[in-house]
Amino acid sequence: MSTIMKHTVGFIASIVLTLLAVYVTLYTSLTFHAKLTIIFGFAFIQAGLQLLMFMHLTEGKDGRLQTFKVIFALVITLCFVVGTYWVMQGGHSSHL
């Protein structure tokens, strides 16, 4: 796929995901938690789309290495977030 085609497809997909998030927020009667979950899902999909379509993550000689670095960074970030939440919940429950 050519670069112009990749950028066009990525741009249109980003707009569609954004409009879907706006639609879910404004025009559905879902609960706040459901809306938030859907919006975060769209956000993660759009972030992956940005990395693949615009940042050319998998292209070139170092494509696999770059992909591994991004996955490693996401795992470390997830460990920090989940670990912090776990410690904060544990500290909160021991003081009650």
UniProtKB/Swiss-Prot annotation:
GO terms under biological process: aerobic electron transport chain; ATP synthesis coupled electron transport; electron transport coupled proton transport
Entry's transmembrane regions: 8-28, 36-56, 68-88
Keywords of the record: Cell membrane, Membrane, Oxidoreductase, Transmembrane, Transmembrane helix
GO CC aspect terms: cytochrome o ubiquinol oxidase complex; plasma membrane
UniProt-listed Enzyme Commission number(s): 1.10.3.-
InterPro entries on file: Cyt_c_oxidase_su4_prok, Cytochrome_c_oxidase_bac_sub4, QoxD
One MF term in the entry's GO annotations: cytochrome bo3 ubiquinol oxidase activity
Topology in the lipid bilayer: Multi-pass membrane protein
Record field: catalytic activity: 2 a quinol + O2 = 2 a quinone + 2 H2O
UniProt-listed Pfam families: COX4_pro (PF03626)
Localisation per UniProt entry: Cell membrane
Enzyme class, UniProt record, top EC level: oxidoreductase
NCBIfam families documented for this protein: QoxD (TIGR02901)
PANTHER family: CYTOCHROME BO(3) UBIQUINOL OXIDASE SUBUNIT 4
Function field: Catalyzes quinol oxidation with the concomitant reduction of oxygen to water.
Family, as annotated: Belongs to the cytochrome c oxidase bacterial subunit 4 family.
Identification of the protein by name: Probable quinol oxidase subunit 4
UniProt source species: Staphylococcus aureus (strain MRSA252)
Gene: qoxD
